[in-house]
Design a protein with these regions (language model features):
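Glycine/charged-rich beta-loop-alpha catalytic/anionic-binding loops adjacent to active sites
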Residues: 35-46, 91-94, 242-252
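Gly/Ala-rich phosphate-binding loop of Rossmann-like dinucleotide-binding domains
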Residues: 63, 166, 273
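Alpha-helical transmembrane segments within multi-pass membrane transporters and channels
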Residues: 74-76
Length: 316
């Protein structure tokens, strides 16, 4: 399967991340102290805030890599403080970020991580009204975007945008992330009827296949492309049902794993933009993910397009 998009429409959330670090491991804590019904009290060794949200992270990655990118999202008034200019400086088209003047704050994501890359995430969508967003098909028509990515958001919003893209003939990635548990059998079947590519980590796709009452192989038969990430191990790539495993690119150091999955997606889309096949694109995705975890902020990593493409040579 070969696809070469010329401009990417990223539909997804914008958030300010609150990142907390527990020195040690969650597993060691659980082995030492009885954890009942998720009740735990942990010391925090580091706390900081940074730009985030899956939509913002992926758009940042694409813009940084030189891929023409349009962001379709909504935000509170605080988006104009620094976040908007930050994305524009990284070549992201923010003309279709709807700012709700009645909402002071954009979404918030609180992530508690340990020293081994494990995370507990809470997402607050904020009060900005998603109904203020432009229709995805109209954005594609106005901007020339010819491939979409639907990042994790409320099921009703994702389904609306999927319908708009499908009716306009724009292929897209369905990436429900932490929202997958809010879907049901019927909604997922409707989403899959649009023949999207499906991205998710092991847990997310386990939830998806459980809701659909199928296994991963059956999901791969229903979707032209399925990418199942496995953290530091790598990823499973299914293309028209055929499976291959792509080893992860090892990171030189681990500063923070937050947003590494979003960076991987940007790397995959970068590869497709440059006319690479899915295997090569997936390999580039692991390189970008590794670069991401070497930096503290999910929108702090950098790598040039030439440098990234050059990493394919020692891999082949």
């Amino acid at each position: 399967m070969q696809i070469r998009p010329t401009k990417i429409l990223v539909c997804g959330s914008l958030a300010v991340d609150h990142l907390l670090r527990h020195s040690g491991s969650f597993k060691a804590y659980q082995e030492t102290y009885e954890v009942e019904a998720m009740n735990a009290s942990l010391p925090i060794s580091d706390y900081r805030t940074c730009f985030g949200g899956c939509g913002g992270n992926i758009a940042y990655g694409l813009g940084t890599l030189g891929v023409p990118t349009v962001l379709l999202s909504h935000a509170g008034r605080d988006f104009g403080d620094r976040y908007e200019q930050h994305l524009i400086q990284h070549d992201v088209d923010c003309a279709f970020v709807a700012v709700d003047q009645n909402a002071e704050f954009s979404a918030r994501c609180t992530i508690l991580g340990d020293d081994f890359g494990n995370q507990i995430t809470g997402f607050y969508p904020g009060h900005a009204d998603p109904k203020l967003r432009s229709a995805a098909n109209r954005v594609c028509e106005q901007t020339g975007a010819d491939f979409g990515l639907l990042g994790p958001e409320a099921p009703e919003l994702m389904l609306k945008q999927a319908t708009e893209l499908h009716q306009f003939g724009v292929p897209f990635i369905f990436d429900p992330g932490q929202w997958i548990s809010e879907f049901n059998h019927s909604l997922l079947n409707t989403m899959l009827s649009f023949d999207p590519w499906v991205f998710g980590n092991e847990h997310e796709l386990d939830v998806m296949t459980t809701l659909l009452e199928i296994d991963i192989a059956a999901l791969a038969e229903r979707s032209p492309v399925v990418v199942r990430t496995q953290g530091a191990r790598g990823l499973d790539l299914y293309v028209e049902g055929a499976h291959q495993f792509i080893n992860a690119e090892p990171a030189k150091t681990i500063a923070d794993t937050t947003g590494s999955g979003d960076a991987l997606r940007a790397g995959v889309l970068f590869g497709l933009y440059h006319g690479l096949d899915l295997t090569q694109a997936a390999r580039l995705g692991t390189v970008v993910a590794a670069r991401s975890v070497e930096h503290m902020d999910p929108q702090g990593w950098t790598i040039s397009a030439d440098e990234l493409l050059a990493t394919l040579n020692p891999m082949n």
